[in-house]
Each structure stands twice: as structure tokens, then as C-alpha cells.
Amino acid sequence: MNKIIGKINVLILSVLMIVSGTAAVTGVFNTNRLTAVAADDTIILRVCNWEEYIDTGDWSDDDIIDLESGSIKGENSIITDFENWYYENYGKKVKVQYSCLGTNEELYNMLTLGDDYDVICPSEYMIMKLMAEDWLEPFSDDFYDTSIANNYYAKGVSPFIKKTFDENKINGESWSRYAAGYMWGITGIVYNPDKVTEKEASTWTIIDNSKFRRQITIKDNVRDSMFAAVGAIKSDKLKSVSFINSPDYRERLAEEMNDTSEANVDRIQEYLQSVKNNAYSFETDSAKTDMITGKVVAGYQWSGDAVYTMDQADEHDFQLNFAVPEECTNLYFDGWVMLKSGINGNSEKKQAAQSFINFLSMPENAVRNMYYIGYTSVISGGNSDVVFDYLKWNYEADDDEADT
């Protein structure tokens, strides 16, 4: 995994240099209600995340991240380690009830049906929706106080991510009032170079290319499928020299990719119907296996899943590549938020929820999660060298393989 993660990290950072600013953000249940506190006064923290999106432990003997600043290995799940850390630091027991969902839309539907969580990890567009609809509990005033020893998020978050969350607002309030970043990345096309050329994969129009009928997968969520559709519909314009060289390129790109006019929405719906007839499937997670088994030759992927897919292919001795469409890419964020209905005025639960976010933001834990799931953390480490050492470790692994 190390070689591929290193390459994708470089790719994401390179894309960031191109699409920073406005375009960087735009792309430019009803179950039984759980009690908040158990009978023995253990704090119950209900966390909902995406599938395969946190270190679950049980690493193999070979899975050791040997950094200059020390070795890192996931023996326990990061959830178990948090529960132990919280008791050691705050003298109170906490039990995380952890569950997973597949899409932002599924998450929203479950919330509207009455399912209760304390901490969830939606994507940026769903964070904005939940903020606008007053679902979210704001962070405590001291959450961003860098003088507090355990405020690892405030001390370690990437300056770019901090600026993005501070400057983007809903109803006059910054994202950072309600959300802390977790992972981020770009979208693109994973493809089999024996079946698909780099040129064919480097455009959103591949999703409707009849040459690959029933051999390509598309993301099964509104934001990503519509983004790809807009990129394909407006491909010629977005790739034109006059458009790219325009002095207000970023603003124009954001305007084109966020065009919600009735005419454009109608075009998108019509186009996605043709894509549905061409694609193998609209999916959330299955494309990773479908690419590895050869059922499909290309798939629209988040960069973290691209890392996993290419790594698994490498273990089976065949190559998969990742292409960023020339039109533009979508730079996305997932972030941790607290729900008002879950916290419900309980100060102990709120402290546990914020501590969970801070624990995940420890540089060592950010590295564990990056290594395990393949995505790029929003944590750059602040004064800690751990994240930087991890990047060096990836690059050196890449260089070592190139020399052999």
C-alpha cells in the first residue's frame, strides 16, 4: 500500500495547488432509542461513519509504520484505544456504539426517520444542509483553544483546511463552528491500462462512452453523479483554451459546475439516463472488487478507494491507474459533526464527542487511519513531525521499489 498511497498523496497535493480557493470546495433509522448513559454511568457515544473509514486494528505482523519519530502499529481498533484513552485522561468510562452507512442521502433519510446519533461524519455538502436545517450542535468555545493539551484538532489541522472551514459559511456562521474535518481527497477514474487508454480515462465523457458499455461504474449519490454529468456535458467548453486562460477562470469554473438552472438540471437528468444505460452499475463500494476481479475496466472513484483498489490489484500482479479528468475534478471533505438531538444538552456526552474528534486528530492516529483506509487526513500535525515523517516514509518506499 505504501507506494500507491505516496503517489496519490502527491497527486492530491498537486491538484490542491491548482484548484485551491473557491473552486476547491465546489470542484471546482427508526430503531430503538439508546440511552445516553448506561446503568454504571458509562457514557454511551453513538458514532455513525462510512464503511471501511476508520482503523479497526488487527494489523498483520508486517504492517508496521516505521518512522523516524517512532513506530506505529494498529493492534487494537482505534475505537477501543479511544475508550481506554478517555478513561485515562478524564476518569470516566465511555462506550462507543459504532455503526456505518453507505451514502450521505441514506444518512439524511435515517435522521429524518428518527434515528439518533451523537457524532456523524457527513461530506461537506451534507454538512451545509444539516447546518442550514439546524441539526447540529456547535463546538464548545474552548474546542479551538490550542493551549489545551488534548485539543489535537485545533493544534494539528492543515492551515488550508482550517481556512476553508473558517471562510465558508451557512446563515452567517462558519463551517468550523459546527464541523471538524476528517479526510479529504479528489475524484477521478480508476482504469485498466490494458483496456482503456489514459486519454480515454482523462475525461468525464468516459462514463457515456459506448466503447465501455456495461464495463464502467458510477457513484450512486447525487453530488458525485451530477458533478460527473456536468463535466461531461460541458466537456468541450471546460477544456477549451479560451476558458482555461480566462482571468476569472476559477469563478467561471465554479459557476459552470454549480449551474442549477432548470435547463441545466433537465440536461443532467437526461444525460444520466443515458449513462445508466451504458454503465455496469451505480455503486458506493462494490466497484473496488469489480475492478480487481475484472468485471469492469474503469470506475469513477474517490481517491482513497482508488488507493485501495490499485493496491489490491498490485498484490494480484496486475496494474490499475488513476486519471484526473481534464475538465476539472471535485475536491471533497468529510467532517465530524455533533447532532443536537443526540447531545441533547448533556455536557458529559458533548465532552466525550469532542474528545473523540480530538483523539482521531492525534498525529499518530491520523497516520493510522490514513494507512488503514487509504484516504488523506486533514491533519498536518502542527508542531509534530509524525505526519511529515509518514509522507517521507511513503516516498522512500516508492524510491526503494523503483531501485529494485
Predicted feature residues:
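Extracytoplasmic ligand-binding site segments that recognize negatively charged/polar headgroups
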Residues: 46-65, 69-75, 125-278, 282-286, ...
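Early extracytoplasmic/lumenal segment of secretory-pathway proteins
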Residues: 37-129, 133
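Extracytoplasmic/periplasmic substrate-binding proteins
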Residues: 277-345, 394
